[in-house]
Amino acid sequence: HFAGQPATTEKPWYARPSHRPAQRQALVIGAGLAGCASAASLAARGWQVTLLERHAEIAQEGSGNPQGVLYLKLSAHGTALSQLVASGFGYTRRLLQNLQRGRDWDACGVLQPAYDDKETERQAGLAEAFPATLLQPLDRAEAERIAGVALAGGGLFYPDAGWANPPALCRWMIERPGIELRRHQQPLQLRRENEQWLAFDGERLLAQAPVVVLAGAAEAAQFDQSAWLPLKRIRGQITGLPATERSTALQTVLCAKGYVAPPRDGQHTLGASFNFEQTDPAPSEAEHRSNLEMLQEISPDLYQRLQADTGATAKLVGRVAMRCTSPDYLPIIGPLADAHAFAEAYAALAKDARQVPETPCPWLDGLYVNTAHGSRGMITTPLSGELLAAWIDGDYKLHRKAPKGDKPVYALFNLAKDSQEKADLASRE
């Protein structure tokens, strides 16, 4: 059966859910950046929000690093992801004004060194496509003056970017009326009864509300209703290096194949590794070594100033977290549909995307997701939380220019299409 309300003939098959709960109450699962942003935006609109976190404190997974970089990986071609990143950067930047500069964030800028010919060409395209207020091409002398350390060449400078402490942003977002944080709560099952979503740990009811937002990164796919979400984990490890008298000369974040930030609380953060194979939560010497090699490539001068040594990694401190991404690296934000009903209703659409279905999308009333922010969470989660809250609250003005790829229904359609293509290939063998 279809859980969604029937759409009118004027609406497309994927028209937004028309479901409106009688009570403005929501349950958000996961208290990292995505969950805290979703909870904050809903509370700002007058909703009562229960925020469930499985750990003893918030921001313990991918949102727990001491320094997150406001890194704008843009495209000169105006892709959906590039649009989201550019918009999200400005939104996050405004929120950070509420935190203590120097301790919780710093607008020290981000410098992307042009480390090879391909990167130099990419940066030249960006410099033509975006205003100088957002990014500025620098020659070597200018780059070294701004960075405070010696570099191999010039690069692209983002003057309003910098670093922030993700846990501090999470705390600020949820320190407001209308949000109840419940720690040590890990729902394993969702059931819908009498217009309410019930979150259970075994047979123990943890919380209930007419609206649920799944915001626990890859854990968002642990429920029966969301198991189809095409999420993947990528292990990332950061390395902490004690600041030295000479390393404090670094004045901006350097971000190439990895990043190194100016010191916070007497320590520089560098990283993060990308490991698609391992899921071990313990820091490894091999990835510490990889991070140090990355630092040496970015700036041999800074490497020496930090007294770094790729042969001495046993005593280094670090942290491991799992990034969560989607196949096209766009975040997945919006309402969830019933995967089985979707597959039945749109089997023909999977074979021929040009068809125009008449059956309205089988939405799961009141169930939403905000996940797959990868390594861009500092930039994309606050705006995504606002987009999602607007959707839930029936305010669609923000969605007129939102990238289509952010909606789970597109991921479900692509999943169905991929399955059909695989079936077609199998039938030909």
Ranges and model annotations:
Residues 156-197, 201-202, 206-211, 215:
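Helical element adjacent to the flavin cofactor pocket in flavoenzyme catalytic cores
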Residues 307-394:
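C-terminal catalytic lobe of FAD-dependent flavoproteins
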Residues 44-64:
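Glycine-rich FAD pyrophosphate-binding loop
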Residues 76-77, 102-112, 140-175, 273-277, ...:
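Helix-loop-beta segment of a Rossmann-like dinucleotide-binding subdomain
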Residues 24-51:
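N-terminal Rossmann-like FAD-binding beta1-loop-alpha1 element of flavoenzymes
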Residues 78, 200-293, 297-318, 323-324:
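Flavin-dependent oxidoreductases
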Residues 390, 394-427:
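C-terminal, low-complexity/hydrophilic appendages and adjacent surface loops
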Residues 67-147:
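Dinucleotide-binding Rossmann-like beta1-alpha1 core, especially the glycine-rich loop
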